Swiss-Prot record:
Pfam families: COX3. The chain crosses the membrane at residues 20-40, 45-65, 88-108, 173-193, 211-231, 255-275. It is found in: Cell membrane. One of its GO terms (molecular function) is cytochrome-c oxidase activity. It catalyses: 4 Fe(II)-[cytochrome c] + O2 + 8 H(+)(in) = 4 Fe(III)-[cytochrome c] + 2 H2O + 4 H(+)(out). The keyword Transmembrane helix applies. This is Probable cytochrome c oxidase subunit 3. Keywords: Cell membrane, Membrane, Translocase, Transmembrane, Transmembrane helix. It is an enzyme of class 7 (translocase). Belongs to the cytochrome c oxidase subunit 3 family. Its EC number is 7.1.1.9. Its main location: membrane. It comes from Rickettsia bellii (strain RML369-C).
Length: 277
């Protein structure tokens, strides 16, 4: 009897083994959020709660994605209906991310198009003045423009990696992914440098709050996307993507996510940096 894994399943339905990771990831996220709130309010043991939350989320996500990769590469469970369902799931996930950023942009436009004076003395905003007169904003054609060029170039390199993957060119795929990762890390370093030299703090008013929430949330997505691409680069070197019809979803989703990050930054650069200045 041949006990090797078949190349396809005997059916096309999306039936996978029961997994503990969705519910465990939910609890880990709850701990992470609780740790973040505790850290902001300087509660007792806040550092330990936050660290435990970060480690728990990282471990759960690693284990969950490891099992998904095993289902596709070893168990050959990713039939066409399964891949179609996973693509829909990723598209819906990106849609929820768009909603997140939509809220930030709505807050920014509400504050910038109709700035009003607050009487409690917390924020200094004068009627019809944006940015607030006490805020020294960034020059949009300094570091923000460099970051725009970096992300546009990274979008080109990840597309190059995609074409190399389609042509079964492992060397070019790994090279292009490596360049994209370097550009992503460079973007994060430039963003950190910009934050370090900012002339305002998060608590200095409505403008800094909107600025740091929008750009910081995007920066977190760049870091997540970079990690996503690093995993894909290791998998490409290992030859996972050479398995026809089963090993491409991870890279495909990473490319979608990275292009989404690129597009969001173009909106941030246009409205928050140029219009907002």
């Amino acid at each position: 009897m041949n006990n090797s894994h078949p190349t396809t399943k005997s059916h096309l339905f999306h039936i996978v083994d029961p997994s503990p990771w969705p519910i465990l990831t939910s609890f880990a996220l709850l701990i992470l959020v609780a740790g973040g709130v505790s850290f902001m309010h300087s509660y007792k043991f806040n550092h330990y709660i936050l660290a435990f939350g970060v480690i728990s989320v990282a471990y759960c996500l690693y284990s969950w994605w490891r099992d998904v990769i095993k289902e596709g590469i070893i168990d050959h469970s990713h039939t066409e209906p399964v891949r179609h369902g996973l693509r829909i799931g990723m598209a819906l996930f990106i849609l929820t991310e768009i909603m997140f950023f939509g809220v930030f942009f709505a807050s920014f436009f509400k504050s910038s198009l109709s700035p009003v004076g607050l009487l409690d003395g917390v924020w200094v905003i004068k009627q019809g003045v944006w940015p607030p007169p006490n805020i020294k904003v960034f020059d949009p054609f300094d570091i923000p423009f460099i970051n725009t060029l970096i992300l546009l170039l990274s979008g080109t390199t990840v597309t190059w990696a995609h074409y190399a993957l389609e042509e079964r060119n492992q060397k070019d795929c790994v090279t292009a992914l490596g360049l994209t990762i370097i550009l992503g890390i460079f973007f994060t370093c430039m963003q950190a440098y910009e934050y370090y030299h900012a002339a305002f703090k998060f608590t200095d008013g409505i403008y800094p709050s909107n600025f740091y929430l929008a750009t910081g949330f995007h920066g977190a997505h760049v870091i997540i996307g970079t990690i996503f691409l690093i995993v894909c680069c290791f998998r490409a070197r290992r030859g996972d993507f050479a398995i026809k019809n089963n090993g491409h979803l991870g890279f495909e989703f990473a490319a979608w996510y990275w292009h989404f990050v690129d597009v969001v930054w173009l909106f941030l650069f246009t409205f928050v940096y140029i219009f907002g200045s």
